[in-house]
Amino acid sequence: MGLLGDVESLSLGLCWAFRQGSGKVALDTQRFTHLSAGSLKLLPIPHAFRAAREQSSYVASEESRILVLTELLERKAHSPFYQEGVSNALLKMAELGLTRAADVLLRNGADLNAEDPVTYYTALHIAVLRNQPDMVELLVRHGADVNRRDRIHESSPLDLASEEPERLPCLQRLLELGADVNAADKHGKTALLHALASSDGVQIHNTENIRLLLEGGADVKATTKDGDTVFTCIIFLLGETVGGDPEEAQMINRFCFQVTQLLLAHGADPSECPAHESLTHICLKSFKLHFPLLRFLLESGAAYNCSLHGASCWSGFHVVFERLCSHPGCAEDDSHVDLLRKAETVLDLMVTNSQKLQLPENFDIHPVGSLADKIQALHFSLRQLESYPPTLKHLCRVCIRLYLQPWPVDVKVRALPLPDRLKWYLLSEHSGAVEEAV
């Protein structure tokens, strides 16, 4: 049997021993089932290892195990299979996080760039997948390329670390070791986009991974070649809540809210076009369903029109009234009444988001049904507000609310040392119309 079998078999035994620590250790005999008793005796393994095969336990210290490995490597250093054997053993050590054994292998010629024959991952990729941060640091200190991508998926170690919440320690270590936080794969996908795309809001919550990447300088404007942005995943997950399990929908909404908070805190713009990639636009279209998130967006300063092209591209006012006019219902319909109430609050939030109201051109509506008069009155109040110079009272309300941004503005309003009547006026949900006095 060649050195490849020698080193591989010995490494398996050493790996298991290292995992159990010093003292009485049970070997994983299943890992030696491919070796016959005769073949095992032919390996240059000390008698203690062969006895362990039969007795399933042995006593050895970590130092003695390192010594065994070192002696074997020195004895077989001139074998034609040496390089392949030690490099293959390094992959196994990386998987199990056995840093001392890996260090011995590296000092004795193991190739940092050796790839697993099945996955084509290097030892660094494997260490990340198994969440072995100390192994990650050891490999990088020995010269492993911290940004190296695998040949199949073009995933970097940072990409892999970002995809699972359990790999947060490796993610942090990679950033500390200088990994490029904004490096992109062949599809233009950065580690931040990997973290977002891997989250389902129910079983996988990469919130802390996303936070760490953003704090490490991840670009919130990153876009893939297919046009996916940091909000693409959130928009998709919000769509999954429609008609789904209520408990799962609640979990998804909570995750989307938390991630949106993080993204906006680091400068992400949820109101950019195209409309189908705009989180603000999506929330406006379904403002009743996504009311808490929409409120957060508007109270955090998100534009209610397209932030790139203004109301000529898309307008929040137009979207809200389009939704109101298309909703079937009657005056006694609780769902329609709730829709109207939330529409009033959303419109009020948009009005207090800027000192000068910006209504879209050709802003005409044609409501039908028993609530048509109320919808028409709401529309008329906005037209009036746009037609006349804003009152001092309105300007003060807008300025104070803008000053109290970001969310939650109403909580901050209630904490102000003001009379209750003034607080009532500053709150977004106080009025039945957008503005009672023009």
Give residue spans per PLM region.
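Positions within ordered alpha-helical repeat solenoids
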Residues: R107, R141, E163, E176, ...
